[in-house]
Swiss-Prot record:
Organism: Crocosphaera subtropica (strain ATCC 51142 / BH68)
Disulphide bond pairs: none
Cofactors (names): Mg(2+)
The protein's name: Deoxyuridine 5'-triphosphate nucleotidohydrolase
Pfam families per record: dUTPase
Gene of this entry: dut
Pathway(s): Pyrimidine metabolism; dUMP biosynthesis; dUMP from dCTP (dUTP route): step 2/2
Catalytic reaction(s) noted: dUTP + H2O = dUMP + diphosphate + H(+)
Biological role: This enzyme is involved in nucleotide metabolism: it produces dUMP, the immediate precursor of thymidine nucleotides and it decreases the intracellular concentration of dUTP so that uracil cannot be incorporated into DNA.
Molecular function per GO: dUTP diphosphatase activity; magnesium ion binding
One example of a Gene Ontology biological process annotation: dUTP catabolic process
């Protein structure tokens, strides 16, 4: 399976897998952005992609940024639809107590390509019964 990628900026870095068995391609910032404590910012990657049919790209946090700096992706996972052709941006949020500086060339998130199953919607009067029923939000214990 292939993804077509355009570099929209000269300094953009094409995403790559850091290791052969990784599921996420590293996305890299093309700009320097300061994210104050408790705030979020859109960080640009300088690339645009064309996904294969029936796939999506999921934007996920990097565990090292989350653990060491409390930086994560705000709308996790962010979804890039198959038809989107604009620049990929990542909404990062700073949950830390100090301001955090994203620098040009920093790996800021992971992009995982996943299959999409499109369904037909059927409106019904009633759903089938299950053992769980309507139990949710802690109904099976903490």
């Amino acid at each position: 399976m292939q993804i077509k990628i355009i570099k929209l900026k000269e300094k953009a870095i094409i995403p790559k897998y850091e290791h052969d068995n990784d599921s996420g391609l590293d996305l890299v910032s093309t700009e320097t952005v300061e994210i104050p404590s408790g705030e979020s910012k859109l960080v640009k990657t300088g690339i645009s992609i064309e996904l294969p049919p029936n796939t999506e790209a999921q934007i996920r946090p990097r565990s090292g940024l989350a653990l060491k700096h409390q930086i994560t992706v705000l709308n996790t996972p962010g979804t890039i639809d198959e038809g989107y052709r604009g620049e990929i941006g990542v909404i990062l949020i700073n949950h830390g107590k100090r301001s955090f500086k994203v620098t040009e060339g920093m790996r800021i998130a992971q992009m995982v390509i996943a299959p999409v199953i499109r369904v037909k919607i059927q409106e019904v009067e009633q759903l089938s019964d299950t053992i769980r029923g309507q139990g949710g939000f802690g109904s099976t214990g903490v």
